[in-house]
Amino acid sequence: MKVLLLFIACILAFVACNKKKIFDGPDFYSDDFESYNSLEELLSNDDVNWSFTQLTSPENTIKPDTSIKHGGNKSMRFSSKKSDGKFVSKCSIAKQNMAFWEGETLRITAWYYLQGTQSAQWLFIMDMEEQVAIGAGPGMRLALVDNKICVEHKFYEDDLFQPQNGGIEMPRDQWVEIIWEVKLSQKNKGVVKVWQNGQLIIDASNTRTLPKDLLYSQQGTKGMVSSIEVGITANSRDNDLVMYVDDVLIQKIN
């Protein structure tokens, strides 16, 4: 029995040391959406473009748009029905099979245009997580609460909010640059920063930014981020919403 346990331990150690070799992927992607004339053109099975969409209502739509754009001649338009008690309304695109590992810093830059001034409590606009065999490993995502960007963890870690008396609301009916930078750590050595139009609105250090490896044997997580999702990743229960996204940049900075 001791020999068997030692053998298993050695195998697990070998796999852990070779994760990066086994689960390799790019750590850079950018898209200005200029080359697409339809949603179908945006998707590809070879990981050159985006990997998949989430459209959980038949009335939700994603399409290139030329009327409201940040740079160039096109952006992507996301139109979503509101969520309710029966289902979560999603209207988003995701880039999978990327590879950002513990100790690395991932930065996502994107321009957002949220149309209208209606309430959008707990509207989710950007996710980072790890794809696994079934579903996705728990990650983090940006949300609007009281019209202010916050960071929600989908694992056991406190969410990150702007100062209660000094937060900055997200402007509506105009382009807003959002930069989300995360140093990945399964321990309390991570860093989370969010900029809105060049102003630092969230700055947290000594925090956990990846789920612990306890989940690895249960769900297949490997201590990494491999999937980035933008758009209306989960709509509010308050209202139907329209959002435009342009000039997305996903990169490792160190």
Language-model regions: role of each:
Residues C17-E177, V182-N254:
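Low-complexity, Ser/Thr/Pro/Gly-rich disordered linker/stalk regions
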Residues M1-D24:
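Bacterial Sec-dependent N-terminal signal peptides
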